[in-house]
Amino acid sequence: PVQRSEDIISTQFTKDTVEELGLLKMDFLGLRNLTVIEDTVKIAAEDGINIDINNIDYNEPKVYKMISEGDTDGVFQLESGGMRNFMKRLEPQNIEDITAGIALYRPGPMDFIPAYIKNKMSPENIVYKHPLLKDILEMTYGCIVYQEQVMQIVRTLAGFSMGRADEVRRAMSKKKAAEMQRARQSFIYGEDNEDGSVRFVGCIRNGIDEKTAESIFDDMDAFAQYAFNKSHAAAYSYVTYQTAYLKCMYPAQFMAALISSVMGNTNKVASYINNCAYNGINVLPPDINKSRADFSVVGNEIRFGLTTIKNVGENFVKALVAEREKNGEFKSLRDFVSRMITELNKRSVECLIKSGAFDSLDGTRAQKLAVYEEIIDSEYRAGKN
């Protein structure tokens, strides 16, 4: 059955029913951070800097140093105070560390963070419950972090098929007790077909003693209900690294794109401007003859975007920039009003004056505030005549 919702035809089946029918179910997520990455590359290109974001160095020490110091404003997934502290303790040295960090920093897996960090700092002290676990868990310092590791363990130690391993993963993640008990039995003792042939060999028939097998299954059971899909975490970690790389290697371009992406959020804009100051990037005030709609880069400095100013609309700014590019810079407040009279309103001009956007023109702010209404009225009258 289907239904129409806002001109879109959609199924009335639940996601579980869709999967049971063998149909493909996909989740599409929109990320503002992808726009920030794209805009950073475009801003850099304006200055003749070519950034091939698909071929950056994922082993740049400066990037990992920045992350380890907690300077992660604008870095995807790493902005929260808790995540900053985690990165400082973790001191990631490669993309795998970031991937694991993203997978661990959630309710449930957080309990495993101390053990993960301890093992990372002293890998020589890691003890595996069975030698076969080393190849599976060595990358995550002896800890089960991903769903894929659970599947790999039951396949390597107990001979499960890929399909059966995925069934175990689902049973663990959804806490299905009956299925879990069956999976435990099969994992430890194996499973035979009706004709007596071996379906899954099991740990004991694979030379692993019962006590060790029980303990390993308990570990999987404890973590699997929280375990993250590695492909999901890896996709996130690459976006994380790309944003961190751009911030580290092209800070002005990145921060300009970042601030432009949150121009409707005053608190975010202020926070990111403070981070610019922290990193030695000067943010120039708005200027009627220099500013664009968005934040832009001038040398190693950032110029304030006009659409960030309260009561200054996007369409008005587009018209302003177009007029400036066509007929040159504005020479005075009256020149500005005369050329923009069909687009402006008094509130917008007042806010531009108060923001300092006219400071480069003759006269003080107080003088401009005292006369701008009279200038606008006179230009309106002149236009009617």
Task: Identify the role of each PLM range.
Residues 1-385:
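Noncatalytic, beta-rich nucleic-acid-contacting surfaces in large DNA/RNA-processing enzymes
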